Design a protein with these regions (language model features):
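Amphipathic, soluble alpha/beta structural segments
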Residues: 40, 120, 124-147, 199-225
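A short alpha-helix capping/helix-coil boundary motif
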Residues: 11-16, 33-34, 64-67, 94-97, ...
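Glycine-rich phosphate-binding active-site loops on the catalytic face of alpha/beta enzymes
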Residues: 18-20, 72-73, 93-106, 147-160, ...
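Conserved N-terminal beta1-alpha1 strand-loop-helix module at the mouth
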Residues: 1-92, 125-127, 135-143, 223-225
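Active-site-adjacent beta->alpha loops and helix N-cap segments on the catalytic face
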Residues: 24-28, 47-66, 77-83, 102-119, ...
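Glycine-enriched alpha-helix->loop->beta-strand junction motifs that scaffold or abut catalytic
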Residues: 42, 61-65, 93-97, 121-124, ...
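Hydrophobic faces of well-ordered beta-strands that scaffold small-molecule active sites
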Residues: 11-17, 46, 65-69, 98-100, ...
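C-terminal alpha-helical cap/extension of soluble enzyme domains
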Residues: 2-25, 29-32, 165-226
Length: 226
């Protein structure tokens, strides 16, 4: 049974535990520690990137893991779980839900419809569609996506990057879709999180504001008198 409800309880806060290679906290051991801290703080789920991080987090928590695999494959713009091999790798590492780029941009292997179908039939995992527009969300659900996230709003060439969370897109998705909608992207304050739930989000995903001390420090340092 791949049902989403047995993996996530809504409403909830999902903490994204990810670090780029240039971050001092890069490494599975650090992401596992972040996940444990998030669980202790009351998080209802973890979003994590790559089989090594997913496996390390799986070893220290029973929280649902929303897994993805970022792979930059030239010349393609799609990098969030771009093909079935990536999806299989994070599923085998212990991810409960598989997140993928659900934009219409070219992909290196399977088309979006085939990818979602293979994840369902071969891996028996629910799919979270990361989108940047309402149209992408509608199409993803038509193709079988089990939930939709605003992850890519402002991160595609054809969408405007808002200063904070894209509440307009969130509102549109909530009103149009019958599947759970996850709000993600540029959340920094409790007020923004509360606003997302007021608009009908089933979950809010917060990453940098919780798990990136370097960026948090940079934001605070901007207020130091020069």
């Amino acid at each position: 049974m791949r049902g989403l409800s047995r993996r996530l309880s809504f409403p909830t806060l999902i903490v994204s535990c990810q670090a780029r290679a240039d971050n001092p906290l890069y490494g599975p051991q650090f992401m596992a520690a972040m996940a444990k801290a998030a669980e202790a703080g009351g998080a209802g789920g973890i979003r994590a990137n790559g089989p090594e991080d997913v496996a390390a987090i799986r070893a220290v928590t029973e929280l649902p893991i929303l897994g993805l695999y970022k792979q930059w494959l030239e010349p393609y713009e799609v990098y969030i779980t771009p093909d079935f091999a990536a999806a299989q790798a994070i599923a085998e590492a212990g991810a409960d839900i598989l997140a993928l780029d659900a934009t219409p941009r070219p992909r290196p292997q399977e088309g979006l419809a085939e990818l979602i179908e293979r994840i369902h039939t071969e891996l028996d995992k629910p799919v979270c569609a990361d989108v940047s527009t309402l149209e992408e969300g509608l199409r993803a659900v038509e193709l079988g996506a089990d939930c939709v996230a605003t992850t890519l709003a402002g991160y595609t060439p054809y969408t405007l990057k808002t200063e904070g969370p894209d509440f307009a897109l969130l509102r549109e998705l909530v009103q149009a879709l019958a599947v759970p909608v996850l709000a993600e992207g540029r959340f920094w304050t409790p007020e923004q999180v509360g606003r997302a739930f007021e608009l009908g989000a089933d979950a809010v995903v917060v990453g940098t504001a919780i798990t990136n001390p370097r960026e948090i420090t940079r934001r605070l340092v901007r207020s130091v008198p020069r």
